[in-house]
Swiss-Prot record:
Acts as a calcium-dependent, homophilic cell adhesion molecule that regulates neural recognition during the development of the nervous system. Component of the repulsive Plexin signaling response to regulate motor axon guidance at the embryonic stage. Also component of a receptor complex that is required in the adult visual system to innervate the lamina layer; specific targeting of R1-R6 axons. The keyword tRNA-binding does not apply. Residues 599-1029 are cytoplasmic. Residues 688-1024 form the Protein kinase domain. One of its GO terms (cellular component) is plasma membrane. GO terms for molecular function: ATP binding; cell adhesion molecule binding; protein heterodimerization activity; protein homodimerization activity; protein kinase activity; signaling receptor activity; transmembrane receptor protein tyrosine kinase activity; Wnt-protein binding. This is Tyrosine-protein kinase-like otk. The lineage of its organism: Eukaryota, Metazoa, Ecdysozoa, Arthropoda, Hexapoda. It is a single-pass type I membrane protein.
Length: 1029
């Protein structure tokens, strides 16, 4: 109690006393292997006053000695002891002038150690064998102990009836193939240990290994390939222990007794001398060698007849693999090894087996192999990224005894530079990589056999970046000059390569008089021609990677293409040449158009026949005729099936396929199913009107417009009934509200929509009245401009599949797809109040929405914020149940209607309107302030990463979207801290107390510990009930 009180008082003094001192470096929590050294750093930014530093260990002042001492402001501990040094360390900075004190946050020290391991039997019966690996050790805050199980030196993994569950080994329905010696190993940063004693499991045999036969009866040669069923008496307990003993004169004189130690690569032999009486020479007797309980080699000593029966069966656990190094001599029973390898180490035993008798076994002998010292694998040179937080170079060595691994730096100074260390496994770790880390490093492995070394070259590089990227489009007139800039920085200095329409440009394949490649990377084109128009790409690269930017060159012609008339016959000749050229070109165009029309007619006729056959197979179901055949012309971007949720509703018969096989039919069958899906979504482009561009997204422009009411189809009855039943099962049905959007009735609508019953209401009647009234539907249109960009096309297809597969009131509807021509249009549901973020800013007074004679809408109440969060959680739960992920959940990607209904949408205006909320990371625009750490580090998107983003959305709601998450940090700092796991999150001040714990759990680094959307919905439901009271 006294120590805790002292710590509390020290922290209170630090928070109360005014001081200009702030910590520039605070002590960090660390995990260290026992007997290694550790350093806690502490430094204040107050350079104008004299400061005194003290250290506390578990709220007690540290008594310094030779092992624990303070150098400057830093604390050094040599030879860390787990019994004395574990705990919290606090740095106290005292201003000697003012007497003010400031305490750093506590830093935890965890000690990693590993002593022993043992195998414990938890349960054994005929249905299950349960073993546990008990380990004396700890791994601190790093990765947990790694447990491996072995059966007779064979490593086990989860397969068939074997299950590995943390420290436990479970074998379901154990049989004879599971017999053997079970041992376990444990490893962490402190080393690796194996259990000294294992557990031997031996199953019982249910019948005698004997077949009835008459006297002097000879078996056919092919009988050795037959399989015989051996069934014992029901309820009987006969086994190997009930077999009669072999005759006393059949015995093993000398076996592999004792322990043999052999160097790797040397020959050796194991002795098994036996005595075989003359009266048993005609009997079937077998000599066997076993290694760790498994059959290794066997040979027949008696009669030539094959041995049949369980006792002579090698079984599934045999090691009878082809190995020319092993020879079993029949004359004296010796097992010889031509060359010993490390895997030959183990326990060996020889046996004599007489038919229908218990085996005779020798005493076991131990063979130990002195493994040759070597690197596994050989260390290799590596390029390290400048300013990388952590970089590792591995060096693993094997040998007997276990070698010690250390690193040195070549040159005059062999010691390692600062921020470079070696862990217990021999891995060279670089922290905060800088240019001083460049050089040659040598890994030394040493044991009693000697020393080996391997040298690697470490090069510190800088990823190439554009200092002056190409900006476009560039417009120039014919005969003019075009200059496209492209300058880059990096280490090594990046090379710059230009290409036109994905074809590389160089001085060898261009006109040197017109094309100039400047030393700084700029491309200059003089006397520009019409054929120079196109897409130009600049690629920069070095050993650290590649980057590319595109720019469009547009050439404007100055005339109509005809040369002016000249005097005499020259002008006439030029005019005649132009007329002939235009005539030939027109004839060619007419021919091409005719061929295209003819091919389209043939394609539509073939498709009609296939649909007729599919209709007959499906029982007369009418084929989809949307688009009048235009959907059959597939763009390359939408010709592939990329999601398992897209399933075709009809299949063509084999005869129909064979009857219309052409040169392209084989290639088109693979995309028939996905093409059928897109045909069902087909919408005519003429049905869209009043398109207004609101921004640009990741693959094109984004518009708001109207869709003709005749083209709007209501959701299927099945989906509506399912959603209605789901809603009623939780909270019942509720009332309805008005659709007016005036400010005078706005507050009443929002107050009437804060209960769960009103949120769960599905306004089916109002939707039907809206559709029957003939009013055009307000829609969001996303254009696919980057048709040749595979990444953009893949994301376009993913969003299509996501919105097509979900029918839920909390997710916007997908009305269809316009793909008659480029660009393709994705048509989504939109609302009269637009995106949720603009609505929040308006209610917070950040956006001027007031008109004459009216006032701005008031801020949302806590009940209304909970209502919005609940609806978003329900929509995301529907996405999760459809086995999809959103990947960009934020208030900017949700929409809200005048009925206070919130839906999850996908505008993703990342190029202009909300560009400051996105950051280009690894050549991809990402909402890094909403992304989970695993998305930034490993590009891994799951439902748990959507849970992380949902926590940020709730943070936005309670802050009225007036500020960005971690707006005090730059984008690069957010990425760096997220990768390092040091980005700290806290809930908004207005968050109810009942939600704080579950919202904080949304941001934990381990995805498995985050809640589900159903759990979040339940918590929000309770919070809403409390708020209503």
């Amino acid at each position: 109690m006294i120590s805790i009180y002292g710590l509390v008082m020290a922290l209170m003094m630090a928070s109360v006393l005014a001081s200009s001192s702030r910590f520039q470096r605070v002590p960090q929590s660390q995990s260290v292997v026992e007997n290694e050294s550790v350093k806690f750093e502490c430094e204040s930014t107050d350079s104008y006053s004299e400061l005194h530093y003290d250290w506390l260990h578990n709220a007690h002042r540290i008594a310094y000695d030779k092992r624990v001492h303070q150098i400057g402001s830093n604390l050094h501990i040599e030879a860390v002891r787990r019994t004395e040094d574990v705990g919290n360390y606090v740095c106290i900075a005292t201003n000697l002038a003012s007497g003010a004190r400031e305490a750093s946050p506590p830093a935890k020290l965890s000690v990693i150690y590993l002593e022993s391991a043992s195998v414990q039997l938890l349960g054994s019966n005929r249905n299950e064998l349960l073993l546990k690996c008990h380990v004396e050790g700890a791994s601190g805050d790093l990765e947990p102990l790694e447990i491996e199980w072995y059966r007779n030196s064979e490593k086990l993994s989860t397969w068939k009836n074997v299950q590995l569950d943390q420290h436990r080994l479970i074998i379901r329905q154990p049989g004879s193939e599971d017999d053997g010696l079970y041992r376990c190993t444990a490893s962490n940063a402190a080393g690796r240990v194996m259990s000294k004693q294992g557990y031997v499991y031996q199953s019982s045999v249910k019948c005698l290994p004997r077949l009835p036969r008459r006297k002097n009866q000879k078996m056919m040669e092919s009988w050795d390939k037959q399989t015989f069923l051996c069934r014992g008496k029901r309820g009987g307990a006969a086994g190997l222990e009930s077999l009669p003993a072999a005759p006393e004169d059949l015995r093993i004189v000398q076996g592999p007794v004792g322990q043999s130690i052999i160097k790797e690569g040397e020959p050796t032999a194991l002795t098994c001398l036996y005595e075989l009486p003359d009266e048993l020479k005609n009997q079937r007797i077998q000599l066997r060698w076993r290694k760790d309980g498994k059959l290794l080699r066997q040979v027949e000593l008696g009669g030539s007849a094959p041995i049949i029966g369980h006792s002579f069966d090698s079984g599934k656990d045999a090691l009878l693999r082809e190995d020319a190094r092993l020879v079993l001599h029949k004359q004296n029973g010796t097992l010889s090894f031509a060359s010993i390898i490390a895997s030959d180490a183990g326990q060996y035993q020889c046996q004599l087996q007489l038919e229908a008798h218990a085996p005779i076994s020798s005493s076991p002998g131990i063979l130990e192999v002195i493994e040759q010292l070597k690197f596994v694998p050989q260390p290799t040179s590596k390029n390290l990224e400048l300013d990388a937080v952590v970089a590792k170079v591995h060096c693993k060595a094997q040998g007997t005894p276990t070698p010690q691994v250390q690193w040195i730096r070549d040159g005059e100074n062999t010691t390692l530079p600062d921020q470079v260390e070696v862990d217990a496994n021999g891995t060279l770790i670089f922290r905060n990589v800088n240019s001083e880390h460049r050089g040659n490093y040598t890994c030394l492995a040493t044991n009693t056999q000697g020393q080996i070394n391997a040298t690697v070259a470490i090069n510190v590089v800088v990823t190439p970046k554009f200092s002056v990227p190409p900006v476009g489009p560039i417009e120039t007139s014919e005969q003019g000059t075009a200059v496209m800039h492209c300058q880059a920085i990096g280490d090594p200095k990046p090379t710059i390569q230009w290409d036109k329409d994905l074809k590389y440009l160089s001085e060898n394949n261009t006109d040197r008089e017109r094309f100039r490649f400047l030393e700084n990377g700029t491309l200059e084109i003089r006397n520009v021609q019409v054929e120079d128009e196109g897409s130009y790409g600049c690629t920069i690269g070095n050993s650290a990677g590649l980057k590319r930017e595109d720019v469009q060159l547009v050439v404007k012609t100055t005339g109509d293409g005809f040369a002016p008339e000249e005097s005499g016959g020259d002008g006439f000749l030029v005019t005649r040449a132009v007329l002939i050229t235009m005539t030939v070109a027109l004839a060619y165009i007419v021919l091409v158009v005719g061929l295209m029309l003819w091919c389209r007619y043939r394609r539509q006729a073939r498709k009609a026949r296939l649909n007729d056959l599919s209709t007959k197979e499906a029982g007369g179901e009418q084929p989809d005729a949307a688009g009048n055949g235009k959907g059959s012309e597939q763009e390359p971007c939408l010709s592939k099936q990329h999601n398992g949720h897209s399933k075709s509703r009809s299949k063509s018969s084999g005869d129909a396929q064979k009857s219309d096989d052409t040169a392209c039919s084989q290639q088109s069958r693979a995309s028939k199913k996905s093409a059928h899906i897109y045909e069902q979504l087909a919408l005519p482009r003429s049905g869209l009107s009043e398109l207004i561009q609101i921004g640009r997204g990741e693959f094109g422009d984004v518009f708001v417009g109207k869709l003709k009411a005749t083209l709007v189809t209501s959701p299927s009855d099945k989906d509506a009934d399912t959603e209605k039943q789901h809603s009623n099962s939780e909270n019942g049905s509720g009332g309805s509200g008005s659709g007016s959007t005036t400010l005078s009735t706005l507050n009443e609508k929002r107050r009437s929509k804060t209960s769960m019953d009103d949120i769960e209401e599905i306004k089916e009647e109002e939707q039907e009245q809206h559709n029957q009234s003939g009013l055009d539907q307000l829609v969001l249109v996303k254009a696919l401009n980057k048709v040749k960009d595979e990444q953009a096309c893949q994301e376009f297809r993913r969003q299509l599949d996501l919105l097509r597969a979900i029918s839920h009131k909390g997710v916007v509807r997908l009305f269809g797809l316009c793909r008659e021509k480029d660009p393709h249009y994705m048509v989504l549901e939109y609302t009269d109040w637009g995106d949720l973020k603009q609505f929040l800013l308006a209610t917070a007074g950040k956006v001027n929405t007031a008109t004459a004679g009216s006032s701005s809408p008031p801020p949302l109440t806590t009940s209304q914020v909970l209502a919005v969060a609940y609806q978003i959680a329900r929509g995301m739960d529907a996405i999760y149940r459809a086995r999809f992920t959103h990947r960009d959940l934020a208030t900017r990607n949700c929409v809200i209607s005048s009925e206070f209904i919130v839906k999850v949408s996908y505008p993703a205006l990342c190029k202009d309107k909300y560009s400051r909320e996105y950051h280009k990371h690894r050549n991809t625009l990402l909402p890094i302030r909403w992304l989970a750490p695993e998305c930034i580090q490993e590009d891994e998107y799951t439902t748990k990463s959507d849970i992380f983003a949902y926590g940020v959305v709730v943070w936005e709601l309670f802050n009225q979207a007036t500020k960005l998450p971690h707006e005090e940090l730059t984008n690069e700092q957010v990425v760096q801290r997220s990768q390092a796991g040091s980005l700290e999150w806290s809930v908004a001040e207005a968050t109810p107390d009942s939600l704080r714990e579950i919202l904080l759990s949304c941001w934990v680094s381990n995805p498995k510990e985050r809640p589900s959307f159903s759990q979040l919905g339940a918590a929000l439901s309770k919070a809403m009930q409390i708020a209503e009271k």
